[in-house]
């Protein structure tokens, strides 16, 4: 019995709906893995990161204030990422010298949340089996190297991997998303996987990480964020973004 026009009008939209559902089910949704860090950052309990609320992280109140000042003598206090970012652009910095490291770490964390909010679902992944272990530095880009001078930075740019730049001596895996690396010059470096998702709309799953640098016999410290990607499971990582 031939289909009439009414039947076709019903079947066609249903076919499209089923097809869209199949495609959506094959997509790899963004993963937000920074719940522990988020819990430490805010004084009160907030909802776990999700695609719906991740972009709100910058406006959430921390539950405490950070004192800032600038060369004109003007001072102000901020208690959320949005205000901190604006103050930094206006020339404010930590009011107390010993809080400068915290000030820079806060800026980095706030920028990380802004970058994570850009993640979308991906179609393919070459990082599903990624582990923060002894092998990771051999595939990570030299941009992750612990540098404290312009001269060192220029030298590092000529090297292909993080391991070749810092000569990692030992690794301590803290969890599936965090590991500590000790280099040949007394550097102590912590890598945290913050999130996974498609950052640059090419359909490939990328990874957002944070890196904290310090020295075992000194006070120097720095914090950095990166988006890394690779085109096969055996390929080295490249940097898509850095802050």
Task: Describe every region a protein language model picked out.
Residues 202:
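Acidic carboxylate motifs that coordinate Ca2+ or other divalent cations, activating on Asp/Glu
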Residues 1-10:
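Bacterial N-terminal signal peptides that target proteins for export
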